[in-house]
Amino acid sequence: MTRKIITRIAASFAAVIVLASCRVDTNVTLAVKPNGTGEILVVITADKDIVVKAPGLKADIRTDDLVAAGWKVQGPTDTKDGGLTITLTHDFMGPAEATTLLGQISGTRGPLHEMVITRTGKDTNSTYTLAGRLEVNGGLEAFADDATLNLLGGAPYVADVQAAGLDLGDAVGITFNAILPGKVNNTTGQSADGVISWRVPMDGTPTSLATSVTNVDIASSISRFAKVLVLGLLYLWIIASVILIFMVLRARSRRRPTPRI
């Protein structure tokens, strides 16, 4: 069974996240096309301090199970500032598959909960609805899988974080982005340049993702109308041509000379 993506990668970073000034940022993007297909993109980036304090981190990251589950993996690769980044993508053929994939990103403690994307209406006039909530439960426990918690009796390094007086929000950042087709009817996120974004609170505060957009495909509507119009004109042209031919033949028959006896 595939371990949750954020849990999977974050487990490799957990040992060094607790060190002062280290940081890991995750961006999850749901991109939906007008026809309902699209892509989910997950980008996880560790800063330079993590790489310096854990030089073997790059080799420790394992993604074989993610690849087996259909995710495309790029990296981990070096960033310009000396950090590491890994990118995971997965295409989907419709909202139902997208909902399933969103469920693979994090565990039951967060940060993504009850994520659902639906589509209603017609191809040329459809409404997309995004539901769910962002919430991190239990601090670092949100980034450890059940097997690890059962083995250790709790999230690893919690005592170190508490002893160091570190704020989880200073060490971990998660942003969820939604790129949905059409005009935004309502959303709880920040919308800019066609992207709706939410920042995941690290203090356990729940954030609703309630969003609705309506997509009216004007080009397709015009195309369909034009097709009907052209067919109608063609039909009229055929009828007019038949009538004209009939009138010409009738006129010729009237002008035909009477044979002499």
PLM region spans:
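C-terminal single-pass membrane-anchor helix
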Residues: A219-I261
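Structured domain cores in non-transmembrane regions
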Residues: K48-G132
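Intrinsically disordered, low-complexity linkers and stems that provide flexible hinges
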Residues: D123-L229
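Bacterial signal peptide processing site
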Residues: R23-D25
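Post-signal peptide N-terminal segment of mature Sec-exported envelope proteins
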Residues: A31-K48
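C-terminal motif of bacterial Sec signal peptides marking the signal peptidase cleavage site
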Residues: V18-S21
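Bacterial N-terminal signal peptides that target proteins for export
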Residues: M1-A10
